[in-house]
Amino acid sequence: MPHSRGRLVEVTIDGSTLTLKTLVSVARSNNAVRIDKKALQRTIRGRAVLEKLLRDDKVIYGVNTGFGALSNFKVASGELKQLQANLLRSHAASVGKPHTSDVIRAMMLLRANTLIKGNSGIRPEIPQLIVALLNKRVHPFIPQKGSVGASGDLSPLSHMALVLMGEGKAEYRERWVSGKQALRLVGRDPIQLEAKEGLALNNGTQQMTSIGSLNLSDSYALFAASEAALALSLEAIRGWIDPFDERIHRLRRHPGQARVARDIRALVEGSKLCRTIIKDDPADGRPQDPYSFRCAPQVLGPVIDAMDNVKSTLEIEMNSATDNPLIFPNEGDCLSGGNFHGQPISMALDMMGLGLSTLANISERRISALLDASLNNGLTAFLVGRESKPGLASGLMAVQYTATALVAENKILAHPASSDSIPTSGNFEDFVSMGPGAAHKSTSILENCQYVVAIELLTAAQAVHLRGDAGLGRGTRNVYRAIRREVRPLAEDRSSHDDIERIFELVRKGQFNDIVKQLVKGSN
């Protein structure tokens, strides 16, 4: 729960109430974090139970045994600390470029949040140190690739945990420092790991959940931009507004479908460009629009419904105990299970990728319609500028090539990672989630979609320019103005690269999300 302290916004974590919005605020706005006192007491109770079980000489997986296929080897009591340090060192084996700071901050936040549930058997100093580093903006070096998503994100989280031991390295103010230097920045000494603490640190789903959560947040902004693009395109071709009538969507009762229709009605309210059966003759021109316009609520509705389902899954995961074994303080038990398994996240992120790919697919179809003189209702072929001659000038012909290339790439990336298990650890871990793969490809799919929607916005704005913008609706007028502040109309052929990049930045930063939100709020 966020608290204001002067200009600083401080977020309290308790292991149970973290939300997507709060995670994004910590990851990207650097909001400070504090741990709820009751949550710290839970960690103390959980640690006490583990220590009692060890005094009773109980055999506990990963605490006094080896790991994975080596779990049949018993470890002597005098070697339990070394076992945990060895685990983190040996499993810090990821490769590639380091994660961006927002992903790392999200990972740190999520790991601290799950540890304070009291089911991991760690001392409170561990999550407290993670939060201290987070608040100081000291970000451990975590390479992107190396996790199969079961047993959790072992390798990336091991890289994060090395810094707590004074090992590895971290980024601070855009320079790399050693693990020991990182700890000095927060006035701490290296942690000497006790029994189970290494396993508690690296056994969880925080990498895939962090990447997926940040991508989902950006996907909501993308979705609003796609609605803005659809509305502007609808006006640009002088399309029919009747398919968005509330009565049609009330008969099917899918919430996303109704939401999209509502948003488009709000965006084009007052439009003199859209046609309606009330005032226009269907015999005058085309009586129906192509599916990419007419069926947009039925196509985009399932996308936003899927995103909402993904959000629910991710927020459950944010507040879950995801390591193994788990301590149950009230019963005094320690049980081995599989909460580290990333299948719920993997399948959710595959679904998100599929939904986003669909969003881009239908956007590309509208781009094609806007450029096609047989479909764009009287505009020039490829929206050649007024001062140019079709044939001599190509207009926006080539932007569809780019959109098509991006959509084709997404069709490859939309293949589900969750269906591609490869056994690991001597076939002991014989079914893994590949959740990190689903997360990574969702990043690529998202960026491709942002570009495709940016291209549709560019194309629709040019079409509106050629037709005349005086009749735009209440919301689309603001969409058009936002584009025109960045990109001038196409009068004669020029490179469209810079234009696309400028609109891409508007999409990425949520400019159209703000327009749609304010509009719908005002309509309600």
What are these regions (language model features)?
Residues 6-57, 84-143, 216, 234:
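Glycine-rich, flexible loop motifs
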Residues 6-31, 35-42, 46-54, 80, ...:
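C-terminal auxiliary extensions adjacent to catalytic cores
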Residues 58, 73, 260:
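Polyanion/phosphate-binding surface patch
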Residues 117-135, 139, 150-154, 174-195:
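Well-ordered mid-protein domain cores that form the structural environment of catalytic cofactors
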Residues 142-147, 330-334:
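Cysteine-centered functional microenvironments
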